[in-house]
Amino acid sequence: MSISFPKMQHLIVMTTIGDKKVNNNIILFL
């Protein structure tokens, strides 16, 4: 889990730049 956490964080950062709506979905998914 600790290994994939940085990947998730990076994905959230990229999604925030790309689309805030998808970012909300990712936060709910986590």
Swiss-Prot record:
Lineage top rank: taxon: Eukaryota
Protein's UniProt name: Putative uncharacterized protein YAL037C-A
Species, as recorded: Saccharomyces cerevisiae (strain ATCC 204508 / S288c) (Baker's yeast)
